[in-house]
Curated annotation (Swiss-Prot):
This is Urease accessory protein UreG. Homodimer. UreD, UreF and UreG form a complex that acts as a GTP-hydrolysis-dependent molecular chaperone, activating the urease apoprotein by helping to assemble the nickel containing metallocenter of UreC. The UreE protein probably delivers the nickel. InterPro entries: CobW/HypB/UreG_nucleotide-bd (IPR003495), P-loop_NTPase (IPR027417), UreG (IPR004400). One of its GO terms (cellular component) is cytoplasm. One of its GO terms (biological process) is urea catabolic process. One of its GO terms (molecular function) is GTP binding. Keywords: Chaperone, Cytoplasm, GTP-binding, Nickel insertion, Nucleotide-binding. Its main location: cytoplasm.
Length: 204
């Protein structure tokens, strides 16, 4: 049993698919690990309620945080509200292996405080255009794993996955990225394997 759970931050712009990815990760990992979730919304607990409605986990394993302001601040400059939620979950479930921390919708400059997140996933979506990876920013360039989501929309919005792949490689260097489609589950296996390997889940 880990003394402290692995904390995985999931960030990205509004509508990129963070909550859908969080739901998919819960479904994929809950049978193997002790798991909990913290979600961030500015004025509501909508994402937490979505996860509860879709039975991602038992309701008591999901805490919705209302940041009441810039979502970036709550995960970076003043992460105290999220750290308190993580601590509450640790007290409630002493044997936790993994806590997913989903940020509110944010911009390309958002990053997680290292106090809050051990690994960061940054989710962008194809419908924002194939130029998005080359716009850079900490999420695109520095996250541990970049998730390029909603690839099924590429032909509908005239986006080139080849261009996105080229620019992601250019902006990220050796850091990995993955194409994903949460509707079909494409890419999920790769994301799960990344979390398990990089987070050393299951290693005594």
């Amino acid at each position: 049993m880990n003394s402290q759970p692995l904390r995985v931050g999931i960030g990205g712009p509004v509508g990129s698919g963070k909550t859908a990815l969080t739901l998919a990760l819960c479904r994929a990992l809950r049978g193997r690990y002790e798991l909990a979730v913290v979600t961030n919304d500015i004025y509501t607990q909508e994402d937490a309620e979505f996860l509860v409605r879709n039975e991602a986990l038992a309701p008591e394993r999901i805490i919705g945080v209302e940041t009441g302001g810039c979502p970036h601040t709550a995960i970076r400059e003043d992460a105290s509200i999220n750290l308190e939620a993580v601590e509450r979950l640790n007290r409630r479930f002493p044997g936790l292996d993994l806590i997913l921390v989903e940020s509110g919708g944010d911009n390309l400059s958002a990053t997680f405080s290292p106090e809050l997140s051990d690994l960061t996933l940054y989710v962008i979506d194809v419908s924002a255009g194939d130029k998005l990876p080359r716009k850079g920013g900490p999420g695109i360039c520095k996250s541990d794993l970049l998730v390029i989501n909603k690839i099924d929309l590429a032909p509908l919005v005239g986006a080139s996955l080849e261009v996105m792949e080229r620019d992601a490689r250019k902006m990220r260097g050796e850091r990995p990225f993955v194409f994903s489609n949460q509707k079909t589950g494409q890419g999920l296996e790769t994301i799960v394997a990344f979390i398990e390997k990089q987070g050393m889940l299951g290693v005594a």
